[in-house]
Amino acid sequence: MTISETWLLPDGVADVLPEQAQVIEKLRREAIDFLAVRGYQLVYTPFIEYIESLSSLSESNQDLDLVTFKVIDQLSGRLLGIRADMTPQVARIDAHVRPVEGVARYCYAGTVLHTKPQNFNATRAPLQLGAELYGHDSIEADVEMVYVMLGLIENAYTLQGAHLDLGHVGLFRSLVKYAGLSKNEEHELSDLYQRKALPELAEFTQNLNMGSDFYALGRYASDLDALQVHLSADILKDTEFDAALNALKITLEQIKNRWPALNVGIDVVELRSYHYHTGLMYAVYAPNRAAPLAQGGRYDGIGEHFGRARPATGFSCDLYALGANQFAEIETVVAPKGTEADLLKAIANARSEGLRVVQLLGNDDLSSIPYATHQLVLQNGQWNIEKI
């Protein structure tokens, strides 16, 4: 083994050095505090669990199973999974460990591990931060979660130039149910919508039951007013479809009232998480970034695997992505060596004010502290901090 092989890291894994680690940790602390004052209680979840627990979403989210590292437990011989997403762990807590009646709000922050990057240039070990609301199936709960997500991004990053995408899988799902489509037809439509293949969609829907409605859903996916004009009266009278459309309208209106300058887009056929989400979906993007800063949605029934299905909505983000290209310039005060009481008191006072103070050791001098910005000097019997 060469020396280089001992310090090389796997693809998609990187060290976080002090200048950026300080930024990331500040973001984490402020985000947790932001969520705490809104009633979201912090939970810590284990880094490994039996795969049966972590794969509770595998039937509805095959992608999660594919990115989960699996190892054999040397104690029990059972298969363990290294968490790739903390959502199923929080679902287990809500369903079994802490079965609260009524609304429960949780937040979390911790490293997750992926077998492969989730998008171009992404890390395989994101620092995932998220918030989840259990026990309330309402538009108000969805709107609260979008508000919390946007508020957090506004505090930690910025909403200037940001773009919010809104969607609702209930529109497509209820239309499929109303039309009585087969699984193959449903899968084909989902693929066409994802590829935005309008010519192919027009051809495919010609002989499809409710075909004009399925075409309208793709053709006017980003314009709710035009969509309503081109949908049939039958589907507009459907209770489930109407509820989904109404939820999307109300959410859009309330977000516009709260953040009038925010660029908000609608895409009713954004179905990447169709088999996982059950209602409203949302994602916020920064300019010149392909991957979302944060994303989430409704996923009712997530705790069913643990014996307690409950309405749920939530979002998550990667703190490394939020803190990318941000580097802290930390002021460092250098104190001379010595054990005099007044010197030690001056050092303690500076640290109590939040300053970073490094005391010289042995034969060290200022040149041995390359990141020093200030020094503690004795003047007229008083210790003062001076800029270097």
Curated annotation (Swiss-Prot):
Pathway: Amino-acid biosynthesis; L-histidine biosynthesis; L-histidine from 5-phospho-alpha-D-ribose 1-diphosphate: step 1/9. The keyword Nucleotidyltransferase does not apply. One of its GO terms (biological process) is L-histidine biosynthetic process. The keyword Amino-acid biosynthesis applies. It is found in: Cytoplasm. Pfam families: tRNA-synt_His. One of its GO terms (cellular component) is cytoplasm. Keywords: Amino-acid biosynthesis, Cytoplasm, Histidine biosynthesis. Required for the first step of histidine biosynthesis. May allow the feedback regulation of ATP phosphoribosyltransferase activity by histidine. Heteromultimer composed of HisG and HisZ subunits. This function is generally fulfilled by the C-terminal part of HisG, which is missing in some bacteria such as this one. Belongs to the class-II aminoacyl-tRNA synthetase family. HisZ subfamily. This is ATP phosphoribosyltransferase regulatory subunit. The lineage of its organism: Bacteria, Pseudomonadati, Pseudomonadota, Gammaproteobacteria, Moraxellales. The gene is hisZ.
